[in-house]
Regions:
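NAD(P)+-binding Rossmann beta1-loop-alpha1 motif at the extreme N-terminus of oxidoreductases
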Residues: 1-58
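Nucleotide donor/acceptor-binding cores
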Residues: 4-5, 85, 158
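Hydrophobic anchor at the start of a short beta-strand
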Residues: 6, 28-30, 113, 135, ...
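N-terminal glycine-rich dinucleotide-binding loop that anchors FAD/FMN and/or NAD(P) in oxidoreductases
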Residues: 46-71, 200
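Rossmann-like NAD(P)(H) cofactor-binding subdomain of soluble oxidoreductases
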Residues: 59-151
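Helix-loop-beta segment of a Rossmann-like dinucleotide-binding subdomain
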Residues: 107, 150-160, 207-213
Length: 213
């Protein structure tokens, strides 16, 4: 199976964990990030502390040197490295509207988007701009800590859910699992997303009260 060419919207904790893991597995990654973050990634690369995941047999922090991926400060520049097979979208929900605004001039160049953001409103918003055939619902239940730009730590390994309703779903599941991301397919995308949101509604206040992560 040919390697995927993947565009990542942002380089936050989830994007770095998933995109970085895919890059470690040999996929081609282009991270679109704010100019300051993109510059940092270009200079220092990425550091992924994945030692918690015993399947990886990683005794030390995994390092991605700057030559092993691309960091671009704008969507226009990132798209010059296309065409892409899929895009990762793991932004905070309050950043979705501005991200969609930036996408508007480039809708014809954008690939299907694997939407990993929390909540249930992001997929409909993306579909409204790009079409339902360009959206693949997904969830992340692993806990990731961010130490700095391109520097993350896997704090708790659970996995990733990917809706199996898209033609790319099977290939994505295979690629994600080859990257040790512990993916599972779900035929009911709405149930998958709502389950994650309800879990967050219960878990987040409890963790705050108990001072747990």
């Amino acid at each position: 199976m040919a390697n995927l060419k993947i565009l990542s919207f942002g380089a936050g904790a989830i994007s770095t964990y998933i995109g970085g893991s895919l890059a470690l597995a040999g996929e081609q990654l282009v991270f679109m990030a704010r100019p300051g973050v993109a510059d940092d990634l270009r200079q220092h690369g990425m550091k992924l502390d994945l030692t918690l995941d015993k399947r990886r047999d990683a005794k030390q922090i995994s390092v991605l040197n700057p030559a092993s991926f691309v960091a671009a400060p704008s969507l226009e520049e990132a798209l010059r490295y296309g065409p892409f097979d899929v895009a990762l979208f793991a932004l905070k929900s309050y950043d979705t509207a501005s991200a969609l605004e930036e996408m508007k001039p480039f809708t014809e160049k954008l690939p299907p988007i694997l939407c990993l953001s929390n909540g249930v409103d992001n997929e409909p918003a993306i579909a409204n701009l790009l079409g339902a055939d360009k959206v693949i619902p997904a969830t992340v239940t692993s806990a990731i800590g961010r130490r700095g730009a391109g520097d993350i730590v896997l704090e708790r390994l659970r996995g990733i859910g990917i809706a199996t309703t898209h033609p790319l779903s099977g290939q994505l599941l295979a690629a994600v699992n080859s990257a040790f991301l512990n993916a599972q397919g779900f035929p009911n995308a709405a149930a998958m997303k709502w389950s994650k949101m309800l879990t967050n509604l219960i878990a987040n206040p409890t963790s705050a009260i108990l001072d747990m992560t």
